[in-house]
């Protein structure tokens, strides 16, 4: 059964990869491919022109129309020139918050989804869950178009897409 410990391990696992937009994301992609392969989930890789970066998508459940895409990106913004009190690619928990490059934007969304794959597989899904992880979102969504085209060509059309990208993550103000 999935629990918060497993999810925290997945968050730490993904944050540990330096996937700054200026470097390759292939080590992270290979790690996720390996995990999904162990779970008997087929993965599809869409590389950039020079083969240094890749999108990854995978279908969990039946290959039928409908279902939902869980969409995220693997790259993070640079840490250079920032005053980090801790190692940016190591998750630190302090005051019930997690700190590390990519925790908010946006490796946590992908980590939680990936941590739930065993439950998804045992749920006897009637419609698929599709993971779609792109590269270079931080510098113009460069990877997403080729992956979207591949998914449209190779998989049944989903009913919905959930994009785990945080928007305006400022603390919420109470409604009075």
Model-derived segments and spans:
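Short alpha-helical scaffold segments that flank and stabilize functional sites
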Residues: 10, 61, 116, 146-147
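Acidic/His- and Gly-rich active-site-bordering loop/insert found
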Residues: 1-103, 122-125
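Fold-level recognition of mixed alpha/beta catalytic cores in primary-metabolism enzymes, strongest
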Residues: 95-98, 108-115, 121-176
């Amino acid at each position: 059964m999935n629990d918060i410990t497993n999810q925290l391990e997945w968050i730490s696992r993904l944050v540990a990869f330096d996937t700054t937009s200026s470097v390759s994301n292939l080590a992270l992609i290979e790690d996720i491919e390996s995990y999904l392969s162990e779970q008997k989930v087929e993965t599809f890789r869409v590389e950039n022109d020079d083969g240094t970066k890749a999108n990854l998508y995978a279908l969990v459940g039946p290959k039928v129309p409908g279902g939902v895409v869980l969409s995220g990106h693997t790259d993070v913004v640079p840490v250079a020139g920032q005053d980090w009190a801790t190692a940016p690619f190591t998750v630190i928990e302090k005051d019930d918050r997690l700190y590390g490059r990519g925790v908010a934007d946006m490796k946590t969304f992908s980590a939680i989804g990936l941590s739930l794959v065993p439950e998804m597989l045992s749920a006897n899904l009637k419609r698929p869950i599709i993971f779609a992880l792109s590269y270079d979102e931080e510098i113009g969504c460069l990877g997403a178009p080729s992956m979207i085209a591949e998914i449209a060509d190779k998989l049944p059309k989903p009913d919905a897409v959930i994009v785990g990208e945080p928007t305006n993550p400022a603390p919420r103000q109470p409604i009075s």
